[in-house]
């Protein structure tokens, strides 16, 4: 049986396969000297090095909140029209709470004559007022973050943790390794003395 296989490779493809590392690619130019001890261990024409260079140079600070155009627009509107922004937030809060309130009131209203119905109605009014208050005080979208920052501050519990750690470590019968946290570095040989043998 005869095989009628025809190669799909052109003569240019075959020449590329036979190229040695000493030839010059006319599109890219001669390869510069590559120092593997430098910042990058990738060759200069590597596709990976091109992808790695897409990150901006000043990425040490991380992404900024103003990079999002929606945040910029909202901040600009808030700065230009502070009264309208507050009224708009109030309107959204009242509409959201009214939908929840009237839906729940429709479910609780038949039970209003019983003790359970009265308690449920007052709990419903209390929760509605609480939702309205939280919506007016906090920024939309940042509720969890804002509550934590307002309750414990921006620095978290740093001062309290520092005080507690100092009190624990200053006691005479305290072993410092028992109170290691994520900020404490313990060498591996101290954690596993058997590995030294």
UniProtKB/Swiss-Prot annotation:
It comes from the Eukaryota. This is Uncharacterized protein wtf12. It comes from Schizosaccharomyces pombe (strain 972 / ATCC 24843). It is a multi-pass membrane protein. The chain crosses the membrane at residues 83-105, 120-142. InterPro entries: WTF (IPR004982). Its main location: endoplasmic reticulum. Residues 1-46, 54-73 are annotated as: Disordered. One of its GO terms (biological process) is meiotic drive.
């Amino acid at each position: 049986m005869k095989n009628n296989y025809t190669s799909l490779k052109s003569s240019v493809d075959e020449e590329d396969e036979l190229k040695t590392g000493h030839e010059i690619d006319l599109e890219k130019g001669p390869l510069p000297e590559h120092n593997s001890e430098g910042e990058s261990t990738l060759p200069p024409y590597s596709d990976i090095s091109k992808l790695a260079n897409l990150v901006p140079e000043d990425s040490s600070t991380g992404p900024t909140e103003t990079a999002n155009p929606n945040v910029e627009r909202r901040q600009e509107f808030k700065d230009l029209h502070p009264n309208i922004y507050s009224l708009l937030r109030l309107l959204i809060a009242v509409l959201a709470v009214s939908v929840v309130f009237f839906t729940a009131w429709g479910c609780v209203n038949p039970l209003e004559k019983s003790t359970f119905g009265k308690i449920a109605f007052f709990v419903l009014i209390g929760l509605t007022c609480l939702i309205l208050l939280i919506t007016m005080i906090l920024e939309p979208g940042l509720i969890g973050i804002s509550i934590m920052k307002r309750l414990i501050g921006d620095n978290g519990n740093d001062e309290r943790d520092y005080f507690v750690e100092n009190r624990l470590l200053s006691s005479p019968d305290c072993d410092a390794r028992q109170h290691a946290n994520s900020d404490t570095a313990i060498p591996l040989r101290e954690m596993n003395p058997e590995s030294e043998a």
